UniProtKB/Swiss-Prot annotation:
Recorded name of the encoding gene: Camlg
Function: Required for the post-translational delivery of tail-anchored (TA) proteins to the endoplasmic reticulum. Together with GET1/WRB, acts as a membrane receptor for soluble GET3/TRC40, which recognizes and selectively binds the transmembrane domain of TA proteins in the cytosol. Required for the stability of GET1. Stimulates calcium signaling in T cells through its involvement in elevation of intracellular calcium. Essential for the survival of peripheral follicular B cells.
Protein's name in the database: Guided entry of tail-anchored proteins factor CAMLG
Keyword Transmembrane: yes
Main location group: endoplasmic reticulum
Gene Ontology MF annotations: cell adhesion molecule binding; ubiquitin protein ligase binding
Cystine crosslinks: C207-C283
Membrane topology term: Multi-pass membrane protein
Biological process per Gene Ontology, one example term: B cell homeostasis
Region (Disordered) location: 1-73, 127-148
Complexes and interactors: Component of the Golgi to ER traffic (GET) complex, which is composed of GET1/WRB, CAMLG/GET2 and GET3/TRC40. Within the complex, GET1 and CAMLG form a heterotetramer which is stabilized by phosphatidylinositol binding and which binds to the GET3 homodimer. Interacts (via C-terminus) with GET1. Interacts (via N-terminus) with GET3. GET3 shows a higher affinity for CAMLG than for GET1. Interacts (via N-terminus) with TNFRSF13B/TACI (via C-terminus).
Short name of one Pfam family: Get2_like
């Protein structure tokens, strides 16, 4: 009667290693579920999908029930079928209850972890679907808007080009007629006469002591101050091919007018310099020819 409990003890001892290996495998499964590929999670959050991601997810979902089916028979410890005495049965049951409770607790924890993992995955999938729908709507709306905006811009520029072409055609005959008679305003004549007189004065009195360009710069500063006291004539803006090209390229007309005004002022200063320098050289040559003793 005594050797029978020893057999049951041997059966329990042989069952404990199999229980430990099953718990290790279960823990490994939980760890794999928790430590999913970080790159896949980031792709799900950001909304990027690889072409093979769907197949991988299906394979993972298929492998999960297979692993659970494999682990279920391994998780049940081996219990001896021979029942001899009530004491031995009670002993076997009492020996088995702790391992069964641990398995139940482990299964509950695994279910909680699975639900905790699946919830963010579902929310991320819903967010990805919403993002994809929003992106699809945006692209569908932006495509006709972009084409419509481009068509309007093209038509507006075409109309501007036609207007500028007509303006150029109308200005060409008037420019050809007015080439011989160029109108000079009073301030322009005053500037040219002043530059010529300054050149004579500099050659006669200041040439030996100062630079010939210092008085010219002083005269230009005086012209800048006296400009507002002279009546301003109406300046006709001449439309050229360059201004037409600038307008068609999208540059505002105000910027073009300002730049043209700046260039016209620079041209006026250059004209004054040419008159001043030519008059100075002419006077110098005349004085050298008629009076060599004159300094």
């Amino acid at each position: 009667m005594e050797p029978m409990p020893s057999a049951t003890d041997g059966g329990d001892r042989s069952a404990t290693p199999s229980g430990l290996s099953a718990s290790q495998r279960r823990a490994e499964l939980r760890r794999r579920k928790l430590l999913m590929n970080s790159e896949q999670r980031i792709n799900r959050i950001m909304g990027f999908h690889r072409p093979g991601s769907g197949a991988e997810e299906e394979n993972q979902t298929k492998s999960k029930p297979l692993d659970s089916d494999i682990l279920n028979p391994l998780g049940v410890p081996s219990v001896s079928k021979r029942v001899v005495l009530g004491d031995s049965v009670d002993g076997g049951v009492t020996d088995y209850q702790p391992s069964g409770g641990a398995d139940i607790r482990g299964a509950q924890l695994g279910d909680k972890l699975d639900s905790f993992i699946k919830a963010p995955e579902c929310s991320s999938k819903d967010g990805v679907e919403l993002r994809q729908r929003n992106r699809g709507d945006l692209t569908a709306d932006s495509a006709p808007r972009g084409s419509h905006h481009g068509l309007e811009q093209y038509l507006s520029r075409f109309e501007e080009a036609m207007k500028l072409r007509k303006q150029l055609i109308s200005e060409k005959p008037s420019q050809e007629d007015g080439r011989t008679t160029e109108e000079f305003d009073s301030f322009r004549i005053f500037r040219l006469v002043g530059c010529a007189l300054l050149a004579l004065v500099v050659r006669a009195f200041v040439c030996k002591y100062l630079s010939i360009f210092a008085p010219f710069l002083t005269l230009q500063l005086a012209y800048m101050g006296l400009y507002k006291y002279f009546p301003k004539g109406e300046k006709k803006v001449k439309t050229t091919v360059l201004t037409a090209a600038l307008l068609l390229s999208g540059i505002p007309a105000e910027v073009i007018n300002r730049s043209m005004d700046t260039y016209s002022k620079m041209g006026e200063v250059f004209t004054d310099l040419c008159v001043y320098f030519f008059t100075f050289i002419f006077c110098h040559e005349v004085l050298e020819y008629w009076g060599p003793e004159v300094p």
